[in-house]
Curated annotation (Swiss-Prot):
<keyword id="KW-0413">Isomerase</keyword>
<feature type="binding site">
    <location>
        <position position="94"/>
    </location>
    <ligand>
        <name>substrate</name>
    </ligand>
</feature>
<dbReference type="InterPro" id="IPR027363">
    <property type="entry name" value="M1Pi_N"/>
</dbReference>
<protein>
    <recommendedName>
        <fullName>Methylthioribose-1-phosphate isomerase</fullName>
        <ecNumber>5.3.1.23</ecNumber>
    </recommendedName>
</protein>
<feature type="site" description="Transition state stabilizer">
    <location>
        <position position="160"/>
    </location>
</feature>
<keyword id="KW-0028">Amino-acid biosynthesis</keyword>
<dbReference type="Pfam" id="PF01008">
    <property type="entry name" value="IF-2B"/>
</dbReference>
<dbReference type="InterPro" id="IPR000649">
    <property type="entry name" value="IF-2B-related"/>
</dbReference>
<feature type="binding site">
    <location>
        <begin position="51"/>
        <end position="53"/>
    </location>
    <ligand>
        <name>substrate</name>
    </ligand>
</feature>
<feature type="binding site">
    <location>
        <position position="199"/>
    </location>
    <ligand>
        <name>substrate</name>
    </ligand>
</feature>
<comment type="pathway">
    <text>Amino-acid biosynthesis; L-methionine biosynthesis via salvage pathway; L-methionine from S-methyl-5-thio-alpha-D-ribose 1-phosphate: step 1/6.</text>
</comment>
<dbReference type="InterPro" id="IPR005251">
    <property type="entry name" value="IF-M1Pi"/>
</dbReference>
<dbReference type="InterPro" id="IPR037171">
    <property type="entry name" value="NagB/RpiA_transferase-like"/>
</dbReference>
<dbReference type="InterPro" id="IPR042529">
    <property type="entry name" value="IF_2B-like_C"/>
</dbReference>
<comment type="similarity">
    <text>Belongs to the eIF-2B alpha/beta/delta subunits family. MtnA subfamily.</text>
</comment>
<comment type="subunit">
    <text>Homodimer.</text>
</comment>
<dbReference type="InterPro" id="IPR011559">
    <property type="entry name" value="Initiation_fac_2B_a/b/d"/>
</dbReference>
Length: 353
């Protein structure tokens, strides 16, 4: 690991298991766990031991490749049917992050013409590893493209964690901050805590500090005051799914930041790879929004903080309409207007996606 980049990887492929950084333990402990079965992988995704759209996709791809090694048949058609069943099981872990389905579908395409079970098993492993390799370069390029939007001295706000541990390396929304550090550009980050699971407080501040990036933590309800008093230059966030018209689903609270940024005339950017786009989804109204366990809101670290019988509404994501977005930063460039047309053109140029 390079001296200027000290953030551990969130997921790695091993000979007979998957090694993950348990993000539920951060920042108090840095704990790595081994996943051996598809059930282990499913549980790790559902319980947020692994989270972040690209990291979820990589982990699921590894999970499919790993589980396929245990399929006992020499019939390639039977093998493919069992792989499809594993794919459908893993795909049900989280409904909003489109990278999950994208990665699994990519593995299925890889073995469409496989002549033997052994060849298919090898191909699945190679393709899953290739997804991780490509994601690192994709994130680095997103960071390079985003960096041109900022100058030394800028104060930038973010929410949730769209960083290195949410991807293979660097992250999406946080990628420019690591690259800025390497180039000695002075950027200061304001990280919203991100209730109720506190990904901003627990993960973003932790990894930015690991990487030597200047960061200040704020509570979510301090965002407006901070934008005004600290003269925030821009807001940059990640995304879990982007519709064809540019509407973007991201962690709950993102929409609030976009509305506030519009009020204060602050640029609001989404940073995401092309694999996060779902061109089959016309607009944000068609994006499924995951609702999570009410205990995430009623308890903190096992301690009750609300009446046990109170009703809870706990959506994990919200959708920011494209008209509130100043630009979508991808590995292929920055989309700044006419989102449907530009997204269509982008995918026409990259038909393999």
């Amino acid at each position: 690991m390079s001296k200027e980049f000290e953030v551990p990887r969130s997921v790695e492929w091993e000979e007979n298991h998957i090694n993950i950084l348990n993000q539920q333990k951060l920042p108090a402990e840095t704990v790595f766990e081994h996943l051996y079965t598809k059930e282990d992988v499913y549980d790790a995704i559902v319980t947020l031991k692994v989270r972040g759209a690209p990291a979820i996709g990589i982990t699921a791809a590894f999970g499919l490749a790993l589980s396929a090694q245990d399929i006992e048949t020499e019939d390639i058609d039977v093998f493919k049917q069992e792989v499809i069943q594993i794919k459908e099981y893993l795909n049900s872990a989280r409904p909003t992050a489109v990278n999950l389905a994208w990665a699994l579908e990519r593995l299925l395409r890889r073995i469409e013409r496989a002549a033997s079970v052994n060849a298919a098993k090898t191909d699945l492993v190679h393709e899953a590893i290739q997804i991780q390799i490509e994601d690192e370069e994709t994130c680095r390029q997103i960071g390079q493209n985003a960096l041109q939007l900022f100058k030394s001295g800028d104060r930038i706000m973010t929410i949730c964690n769209a960083g290195s541990i949410a991807t293979s390396r660097y992250g999406t929304a946080l990628a420019p901050f690591y690259l800025a550090k390497k180039k000695n550009l002075d950027l200061h980050i304001y990280a919203c805590e991100t209730r109720p699971v506190l990904q901003g407080a627990r993960l973003t501040t932790w990894e930015l500090m690991q990487g030597g990036v200047d960061v200040t933590l704020i509570t979510d309800n301090m965002a407006a005051h901070t934008m005004k008093e600290k003269q925030i230059s821009a807001v940059i966030v990640g995304a879990d799914r982007i519709a064809r018209n540019g509407d973007a689903a991201n962690k709950i609270g993102t929409l609030s930041l976009a509305i506030l940024a519009k009020h204060f005339q602050i640029p609001f950017f989404i940073a995401a790879p092309l694999s996060t786009f779902d061109v089959s989804t016309k607009d944000g109204s068609d994006i499924p929004i995951e609702e999570r366990d009410p205990l995430e809101v009623k308890e903190f670290n096992g301690v009750q903080i609300a009446p046990p019988d109170v009703q809870v509404f706990n959506p994990a994501f919200d959708v920011t309409p494209h008209h509130l977005i100043s630009g979508i930063i991808t590995e292929k460039g920055i989309i700044t207007s006419n989102y449907t047309e530009e997204i269509d053109a982008l995918f026409a140029e990259n038909i393999s996606l």
